[in-house]
Amino acid sequence: MDMNKSSFVPPFRIQLAVDGSEHAVAATQLIRDLPLPRNSLITILGVVPPGQSLYESKLRAALMQAEKTLGRKTVETEVVLLYGHAAKQLIEYGSEHRPDLMVIGAKGLYATLKILLGGLAQQVVEQAHWPVLVTRTPYHGLRRVVLATDGSQNSRLAAEYLAEFPLPHHAEIQVVHAQPLLEEAATFAHHMGPIAYLTPSMPLQVDRPTLSHQAELQKQRGRAILAETRRILEGGSHKAKGIILDGDPASQILAYSELRGIDLIVAGSRGLSAIEGWWWGSVSRKLVHYAHSSVLFVRTEAENNVPE
């Protein structure tokens, strides 16, 4: 998707993985609610795993139902049936036909088939070089959206993507910056050299005045991150509110989203460098597994050129 503002809004290319499960139905309904630009293309993908030919007829019915749900005059739809292991097929198809967005259900219909399960969602999120939206039920529309940011370049790319994303006009966006407790961050950084883990026998003496000063600097940085992120969103005509949370980012984002009834969490798939942003590394994985809402992980071609 072109990030440059212009009077022409380019068509949006979406790849939707369908298996007939309630999560895939929710994904279809979510896409239906997006105000997509004219001539956008929705490719509805079905994957028949090895040795499961009897599943094909059920899958074809699910694909036809999804196409019927998504049918509209201004948007093109096509159905593609793939054969093989789901993660491999989706990644290969996405690599060949670069989407602006790939959408998959968090869980699949038949656990024994291992189609579109949480494990698959994690594989696709980690391997894809394009944005991936993992949907969950129940789906009640996109009313409240959280953009999680840690101030990294990848978070900036996520904000730029969301600024141009075709959200429903009534959707409210909240920018959340979750910063770990300073003592925890300082302790981890102190031991990041040859030892990458902590035990109770590894205390770190932290000077309180220094901590107080660092805490104030951290707050200032957090406010600056929120201000810059909101500026990016407003460039795409999306108004947003900002909030700073203290504590483990994944836990704070999950708790805040559940408390506020958030419908969609948006995050970059990678964060800061290992030392400066150690707390962000596992956030995307935790969001895939534990979020009650749908989650959009933003990876772009530009991100591939961002240093770790």
Give residue spans per PLM region:
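Small/aliphatic-rich secondary-structure junction motif
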Residues: 2-58, 69-75, 144-209, 232-241
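Active-site phosphate/pyrophosphate- and oxyanion-stabilizing loops and adjacent acidic/basic residues
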Residues: 32, 64, 122, 160-163, ...
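General small-molecule cofactor/ligand-binding pocket signal
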Residues: 43-45, 78-82, 133, 176, ...
